[in-house]
Amino acid sequence: MEAWGQSPACSSSRKARTGPSLASVLNDLPSAATLRYRGPGVLPWGTLDEDDDEGGRSLQAFAETAQMESHPSRELPWPMQARRAHRKSQATGQLASGSESRAAYWTRQLSRTKGKMKEGFQTIQPWAWTLKKIGGQFGAGTESYFSLLRFLLFLNLVASVIEICMKLIPTWLEGAPPGPPGPNISSPCGSYIPHTHGLVAFPTQLFNLLSGEGYLEWSPLFYGFYPPRSNLAITYLCSVFAISVIYLLCILRRSVSGLKETLLAESDILTSYSHRVFSAWNFGLCGDVHVRLRQRIILYELQVDLEEAVVRRRAAEQTLSQRAKVWSMRALLNVLVLALLGAAFYGIYWATEYTLTLQETPLVRQTPLFKLLVDYLPSIFISLFNFVLPPVFKFIASLEGYTQSRQIVLILLRTVFLRLASLVFLLVSLWSQITCGGNMEAEGCKACGYNYKEIPCWETRLGQEMYKLVLFDLLMGLLVTLLVQFPRKILCGLCPGALGRLSGTLEFQVPDEVLGLIYAQTVVWVGSFFCPLLPLINTAKFLILFCLKKITLFSIYSPASRTFRASTANFFFPLVLLVGLAISAVPVLYSIFLIPPSKLCGPFRGKLSIWAQIPEAIESLPQTAQNFLYFLGTQAFTVPLLILSSILMMYTVALANCYGRLISELKRQIETEVQNKVFLAQRAVALSSRNGTS
C-alpha cells in the first residue's frame, strides 16, 4: 500500500537529486590505482555486500585465512570479531588434532618466558622510579644523563669483579707476593724503591693517599705490585681483553637501540604532532604522581618540536645575503673555537713537561704541599680548561643560529674534543718522558728500552697519573657543588634584587655533565691496565656522584628553559663513549706491543714486550693445541673467514636495502592515505554545499 510507503513522486524526486554513488566516489580516490585490503577476506574498496550471508561468509573467509597465521590472535592487526573467529578456529583445530606440536608449544613457552624476564628486569632495575621522576620534572635530556651514569656504574662494577677474580685473587692464591725491591747496584736498569720504610707523619700519609705514592705505590692498586708469575701474567693480560670486549658489546647494544630512535625522530614520518597527542599517553598509569610526570614528559617533547620548528621556519625565510652573513659568522666562531682549543692543549703539554723540572727543585722536594701541587699540575690544568671552556662553547653555539638539538651536538663535539684531546696530550707528554722522546738510542733509554733513570717503573707511573686524574675529578665535583652551587642557590633565594639576578638561576647543563662522565670513563679505560683497581674506585666515585647529583638536582637546579630530544642523547652519548673507548685502546695496545716492560716491577718483567708472554704460554701447551692456535693465524683460516664475513656483509646490506624499499613503500602508502582523506573531505564539502543549494 502506498500509505505505508513512499509516493512515486517522492521516489522520482529523490533519484533525481541523488549524486554519485559511494563506489564511484571511492573509485576516484588517489589510491584507486592500487587495490587495497584491510585484512584477509575483506572486500576491496567500493564493493558492497549483497546480503548478510555474504558478510558471514566474509568473516568465515577471514577466520579461515587467519588460521594459517602463526601469530597469536592478540598480535594480529584485525578487527575484534575476526580475532575471536581466529581464536575459535585455533581451539577447534587443536581439539581435532589432539594437541599442538611440541615445537610450537616450546616456541610459545619460550616467547612467554622471554617477555616475563624482560618485564622483570625492567622492574628490578635500580633507580627506575628516580629516573622516571627526573624525566618528568626536568626533561628527557636530564634523564638521559642519569641513565648513562647508571649504565657506566654497571659497567665499572662488572669490570671490578673481573679485575678482582683474574688479577687479585690469583696473586694471593699462588702465595704471598714478594715485598718491594731494594737497592740493586748490579742491575743495568738501576734500582726501584717504591716507598720509604719506617714511621711517617700524617701529612705524608695524606700526601701518599692523594698522589698514589708511598705505601700505595707497592700495593694491589698498581701494576708494579704483581709478581712475575706466568699464570698470573696470562690472566692479567686476558682480563684486559675480556673487559674491553664486554665494554664494546654493551656500548654497541646501547648505541644501536638509540640509533633507531634517532632515525625515527629525524625522519619526515613524525613531523606532525598528532602521534604525540594521540599515541604518547600511557593508559595504564595509576596515581596522580605518575599522571603528572607523564604529562610533563609529553610537554617537554612538544616544546622541543615547537622550538625546532620555529628555528627551521626562520632559516627557510632567510634571504641569500642573510645566509651568507650567518655562514661568515659561523666560520669566524669556529676559528675562535680552534684558537681556544690550541691554547688549552699547549697549556696542558707545558704543564706535563714542566712537572719533572719542578719536582727536582729543592723547595718542592722539601715541602710536601708544593710537591703535591706540582704532582697535580697536569690535572689542575686539565680541570681548569674543562671548567672554563664549555660555557664559552655554549655561548658560541647560541650565536650560530642552529636548532637546539644541533647546538647540543656542537657543544658535545667541541667539549669532547677538548676533554679527550687534553687526555691525549697528557699521554703524549708521558710517552715522551718514558721513551726519551721516541729515541730509543738515547743515553737514558739505550740500556733498557725506556727511561729507567727517571721512571724505573713506567707502568706504575702511568697508573698514578690516571689515579690522580680520577681522584682530582671527584674532588673538584665535590668542591664545586659544596662551595659554588649551594652558596649560589642560597644567594639567589635570599637576595631577590639585583644581586640575586646576578647570581642567576641554576640549570642542569646536560652536555657538560655528560662529557664529564665520558672523560672520567676514558681515563679509567686508559689506566685500568696500569692501575687494576681503578674500575673499583670509579664505581665508588660514580655511586657518590649519582647520589650527589640527584640531591643537588631536586634542591638546587630548576628545569631547563631549553630542552632537546631524548633520541639525540640516547644515540650521541654512546657514540661518544665509543670514541673514548677507541682513544683509550691506542695507548694500552701501544704499551702492550711496542714499549718494553719495566725490568724491576710487574708480572712481565724481563720480557721483550708484554705480548711476548702469550707466545711463550702457547709453546707450553700440547702440540695439538699449539697447531690449532697457530692455524688460526695462517691464511688457510683467515681467507675463508674473510670470504664468509664478506658474504654475510653482502647479505646484511641486501637485507637492509629490502627493508629500505619496504619502508619507502610504507611511507608512500601513508602519503596516499593522507591524500585520500583530503580528497574525501573535499568531496564531502562539495556534496553538502550542493545539497544545501538544491
UniProtKB/Swiss-Prot annotation:
Which residues have a glycan attached per UniProt?
A: N691
Disordered, as annotated region: 1-21
Topology feature Extracellular, residues = 1-150, 253-330, 398-407, 487-513, 557-574, 657-694
Per its record, the protein catalyses:
chloride(in) = chloride(out)
Q: A GO molecular-function term, please?
A: voltage-gated chloride channel activity
Cite the record's tissue specificity text. Expressed in taste bud cells of the posterior tongue. Ubiquitously expressed.
Phenotype of gene-disrupted mutants: Knockout mice show impaired glossopharyngeal nerve response to high NaCl and KCl. Slight increased lick ratio value of KO mice for NaCl solutions compared to wild-type mice. No significant difference in Na, K, Cl, Ca, and Mg content in the sera and urine compared to wild-type. No apparent difference in morphology of taste cells and the expression of representative taste-related proteins compared to wild-type.
Locations listed in the record: Membrane
User: What UniProt keywords are attached to this protein's entry?
Assistant: Glycoprotein, Ion channel, Ion transport, Membrane, Transmembrane, Transmembrane helix, Transport
Residue spans crossing the bilayer: 151-171, 232-252, 331-351, 377-397, 408-428, 466-486, 514-534, 536-556, 575-595, 636-656
Q: Does the keyword Aminoacyl-tRNA synthetase apply?
A: no
Q: Which InterPro entries match?
A: TMC, TMC_dom
Recorded hits in Pfam families, A to Z, give: TMC
Q: Indicate where this protein is primarily found.
A: membrane
Membrane topology classification: Multi-pass membrane protein
Q: Does the keyword Transport apply?
A: yes
Q: Which residues lie on this side of the membrane: Cytoplasmic?
A: 172-231, 352-376, 429-465, 535, 596-635
Q: Give the GO cellular component terms, alphabetically.
A: plasma membrane
Give an example GO biological process: sensory perception of salty taste
* UniProt similarity note: Belongs to the TMC family.
The entry's function note states: Voltage-gated chloride channel involved in high-concentration salt taste sensation. Depolarization induced by high NaCl concentration may trigger the activation of TMC4-mediated chloride influx into taste bud cells, helping the return to resting potential. Also allows permeation of organic anions including gluconate, but their current amplitudes at positive potentials are less than that of chloride. Involved in pH and temperature-dependent modulation of salty taste.
* Name listed for the protein in its UniProt record: Voltage-gated chloride channel TMC4
**By which gene is this protein encoded?**
Tmc4
